[in-house]
C-alpha cells in the first residue's frame, strides 16, 4: 500500500519591535540574564498589561502579505499552564478570535507547478522565558518572556517534507521583506513545529498525528519530517497503534524522541483575558498598513525575470533576502550586465560569504564597486580569473577594484605579439604535448594554454592565448 504524508506547520516569528508586547522592556537579544524584565512581564501581583500598538500593526501587515482576512474585532485570551519559563502560569495569546484568518502561500513544485498552502490563522501572543539546563540544575532567563510573537498556522495541505521546506522558505522571505521579523532561526526568532500523520494515497481520512519540535533549520525540518513519515508508515504497516504525542528532533542522532503525550485544547482552559479590552481594527487602519507593504519577494523575482532577463531560478535565489535583491538590482543597473551580476552574487560572493559566515549587509564593498569590477572584465582590462583575485581583495579591504588592479599591476595583456612570443617558447620546450595533440589528444592544448597563463602570471588575455596556441599547434 502506498502512503502519503499530511503535514501542517506552526511557525512562531518574533516581531521586530523595540519593546515587549505588554510592557516597555526592551526586546534586544543577548542581554545579561534577567535584566530585560519588569513586574508586568514577570507577572507580579498588581501589574497590568498594556497592548503594544506596533504588535497589532505588524500582525495586520503579516496577514495582508499572506493573503489573509483581518478580523476587525478580536480579543486576547489566557492559555493556562504551569512551567518554569512561564512566570504568570498563563500565556496571553489568542484562541477563538485571532487577528487573521484564511490566507495562503503559493509555492512552486519541482515540476514547475504552483501549489497553494492554506493558512488557517495568524494570532498574536507573548513568548516564554528560556530554560538553560546544566549539570547543577536548570536556570531560567526571563529576558525573552513577553517578547511579541505571531504564530502562523498552516492548513494540513502539505504532502511532502520538501513542500514543507519550500513553504517555510517562502514564509521566511515574505516576513523578512515586510520587516516584521528578522527571522534569524539561529537566534530563535523564527521557530517551526510540525504536525504530521500518514494516510493511504487517495484517502481523505487523516491518521494519528505527531507534533515535532526543535526543528531550528530548513535541513532539520526536512530530515525530521522524513524520519517521522517513515516511522509512521512502518508502524501502520505492522498494524501498530499510533498515539497522538509531542516529539522533539534529536539532531545528533537524526531521530525524533518522545517528549509527552499530546495535550488537547481544553487542557489549557482558555478564557478571555480580563485585563485587556476587545481590540477593534478599523478599515482605515488596515488600508494605512497595506500602503506600507513593499514589493514582495515573488513579485520582485517575476520583475527581475522580465526586466533583466535572468533565469527564474536566479531570480528566486536572489530574492530570498531583500538585502541580496537590492544589492543585485543596483549592481545590474550600474554594470548594465544583469546576468554577470547574478553569476557573481550567486557564485563567488555567496561562497565567500558562507566561508566567512557573513551576510550581504556585512560586505565591505557596495554595488557600485562590484559593477566597476564587472566593467573591468567586460572591457578586457582584466581577465575573469584576475577578477576573482580582485574580488578576494575587495572582501578583505573594501578597496575599489580599479585601485587594486593598478596597485598590483593586474592589467590584462592584450598584446598579441608579446603573447605569441611566449606561446612559441612554450611549444618549443614541450614537443611531447604537440605530439600528443597530433595523435588526437585535445587535452594537450589545454596543458599548453595553462603553461602560457602561468608564464604570464595570469595576465595574458585567455581568448588570445587559446587562439594563438591552437594556430601554432596546427602549424606543427
From Swiss-Prot:
NCBIfam families cross-referenced by the UniProt entry: gatB, PRK05477.1-2, PRK05477.1-4
Protein name: Aspartyl/glutamyl-tRNA(Asn/Gln) amidotransferase subunit B
Subunit structure: Heterotrimer of A, B and C subunits.
GO molecular function, one term: ATP binding
Family: Belongs to the GatB/GatE family. GatB subfamily.
UniProt superkingdom: Bacteria
Function summary: Allows the formation of correctly charged Asn-tRNA(Asn) or Gln-tRNA(Gln) through the transamidation of misacylated Asp-tRNA(Asn) or Glu-tRNA(Gln) in organisms which lack either or both of asparaginyl-tRNA or glutaminyl-tRNA synthetases. The reaction takes place in the presence of glutamine and ATP through an activated phospho-Asp-tRNA(Asn) or phospho-Glu-tRNA(Gln).
HAMAP family in alphabetical order: GatB
Gene Ontology process terms (BP): glutaminyl-tRNAGln biosynthesis via transamidation; translation
EC number(s) reported in the record: 6.3.5.-
Any Pfam family the entry gives: GatB_Yqey
Catalytic activity: L-glutamyl-tRNA(Gln) + L-glutamine + ATP + H2O = L-glutaminyl-tRNA(Gln) + L-glutamate + ADP + phosphate + H(+); L-aspartyl-tRNA(Asn) + L-glutamine + ATP + H2O = L-asparaginyl-tRNA(Asn) + L-glutamate + ADP + phosphate + 2 H(+)
UniProtKB keywords: ATP-binding, Ligase, Nucleotide-binding, Protein biosynthesis
Claim: ATP-binding is one of the keywords in the record: yes
